[in-house]
């Protein structure tokens, strides 16, 4: 991420995603160690040490904050808990990183020097530790309050797109505001499951966090009031924390987080939907450094960015009808089969210095209109999640086809960081797309995923993805056991036309928990199976419509 061959903050969390599928041993400790890179102000260390859990203070006086960094830990943590059922991870404790940067990189702590150390302390000089839940809340709540003039989360130094780096004053990332809204809803969901499993009614949190838990629509509507709440919190813990903890009702906390998530999604639906002259629509993803909406049908042509579509789809902001319009618009303005699928953006036709350096690249190179594998895969993932399997498959297949076409891509098979305007694969070793591609094929296309430790089978395979025997199968590890899962589509139905009729495990028909389009194999049933063999699951698909 930083041009020096080292690992960046996002890498830590995306590597864990892949490991959870390929080699899950040790991931729990890795997660705990990674959380120690979070600061108490919700930002995080950006220089990663050579050892696991080692973070280095930035000595270059560069106080750059990537506003998306708080998103990724929750995505990985949720995936881990769903795969394992290990809700107790939420109550495990980790330290907080400390250096001279405070107030989310806007001020310097003049009282800090290296003799203080790199771990946050309380006023009593004791190392501050908080639960994983507390770390997640701080990352997502501080972001919720750090808004620009249009009440979306500020872009700051950049988001996932590192080249959106010239709008630190007035820039806003609507794209990742959606992601944070989704995270707040997901934390609420995990809290509900935690309460149900443990029987606990309260959680212990840093006393200062209470100010971030005000629940009031009038507050949410006001940029000024939000920034005041954030500043109060940042001031309260800018050098040391109080060291005090408070007990918070899980039920009230869950409700609080849902209200924030719902408010943010509704705000985006209401204000950020744009249309072209033919009434086809998509979401605006950004505001530039003049405070202007970036996307839409402008005097210089249509401006559309893929990132701004991925997260409203994935988080649930976009309605099904809006998704239909987004896919139509993306196919029209972003899709180019010759270069590997969905470009990151349309050609803005200007060097837009009030948004980022990306517009200084020639169109089709790097972040300016290349097919960026990571976001193209996440677009597919989001579409699959919402039941748009055909559209999701189109993005994945385009990347695969381009990678395999050596005459054009000039790369060994695999996923590069991006395909340029000539369709050539670039930076084969710099990609988080591989983790997400594997994740999407297994958990969405084949539909084998965890849900707080249960195994969910929810295939979203297209008719043409079954072989001549009408079968599609995969092998994987889940719950410390090896599995081969085979779907039988004897009636030759397409996704949306079939549902699960029968499930057998090692030749025995089982009573699965049925839903219209998925089967649930409970964790307690899985635990009774031996760990020494590859367990065979056969799933029979039969006529039955899925309603989107």
Residue map of PLM features:
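Acidic, mature catalytic/reactive cores of soluble proteins
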Residues: 1-548
């Amino acid at each position: 991420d930083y041009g020096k061959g080292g690992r960046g903050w996002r890498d830590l969390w995306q590597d864990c995603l892949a490991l959870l599928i390929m080699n899950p041993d040790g991931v729990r400790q890795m997660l705990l160690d990674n959380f120690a890179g979070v600061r108490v102000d919700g930002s995080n260390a950006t220089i990663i040490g050579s050892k696991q859990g080692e973070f280095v203070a930035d000595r270059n006086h560069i106080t750059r904050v990537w506003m998306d960094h708080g998103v990724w830990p929750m995505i990985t943590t949720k995936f881990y808990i769903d795969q394992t059922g290990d809700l107790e991870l939420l109550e495990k404790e980790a330290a907080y990183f400390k250096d001279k940067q405070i107030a989310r990189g806007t001020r310097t702590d003049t009282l800090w020097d290296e003799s203080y150390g790199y771990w946050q302390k309380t006023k009593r000089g004791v190392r501050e530790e908080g639960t994983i839940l507390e770390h997640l809340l701080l990352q997502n709540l501080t972001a919720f309050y750090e808004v620009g003039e249009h009440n979306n989360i500020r872009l700051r130094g950049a988001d996932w797109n590192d080249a959106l780096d010239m709008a630190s004053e007035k820039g806003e990332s609507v794209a990742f505001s959606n992601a944070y809204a989704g995270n707040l809803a997901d934390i609420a969901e995990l809290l509900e499951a935690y309460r149900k499993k443990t029987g606990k009614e309260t959680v212990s949190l840093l006393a200062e966090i209470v100010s971030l838990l005000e629940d009031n629509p009038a507050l949410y509507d006001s940029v000024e009031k939000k920034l005041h709440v954030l500043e109060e919190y940042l001031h309260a813990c800018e050098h040391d924390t109080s060291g005090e903890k408070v007990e918070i009702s899980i039920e009230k906390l869950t409700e609080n987080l849902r209200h924030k998530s719902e408010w943010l999604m509704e705000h985006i639906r209401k204000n950020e939907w744009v249309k072209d002259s033919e009434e086809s629509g998509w979401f605006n993803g950004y505001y530039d450094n003049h405070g202007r909406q970036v996307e839409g049908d402008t005097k210089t042509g249509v401006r559309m960015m893929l990132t701004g579509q991925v997260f409203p789809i994935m988080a649930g902001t976009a309605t099904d009808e809006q998704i239909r319009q987004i896919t139509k618009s993306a196919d029209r303005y972003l899709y180019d089969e010759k270069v590997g699928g969905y470009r990151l953006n349309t050609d803005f036709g200007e060097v837009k210095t009030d948004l980022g350096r990306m517009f200084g690249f020639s169109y089709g190179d790097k972040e300016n209109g290349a097919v960026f594998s990571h976001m193209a895969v996440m677009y597919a993932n989001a579409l699959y999640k919402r039941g748009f399997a055909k559209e999701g498959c189109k993005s994945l297949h385009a990347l695969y086809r381009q990678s395999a076409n050596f005459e054009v891509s000039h790369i060994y098979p695999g996923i590069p960081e991006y395909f340029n305007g000539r369709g050539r694969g670039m930076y084969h070793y710099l990609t988080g797309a591989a983790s997400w591609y594997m994740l999407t094929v297994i958990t969405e296309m084949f539909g084998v995923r965890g849900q707080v430790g249960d195994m969910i089978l929810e295939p979203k395979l297209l008719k043409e993805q079954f072989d001549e025997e009408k079968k599609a199968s995969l092998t994987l590890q889940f719950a410390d056991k090896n599995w081969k899962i085979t779907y039988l589509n004897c009636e030759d139905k397409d996704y949306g036309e079939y549902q699960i009729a029968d499930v057998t495990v090692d030749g025995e028909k089982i009573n699965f928990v049925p839903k219209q389009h998925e089967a649930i194999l409970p964790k307690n049933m899985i635990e009774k199976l031996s760990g020494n063999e590859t367990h065979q699951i056969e799933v029979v698909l039969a006529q039955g419509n899925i309603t989107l």
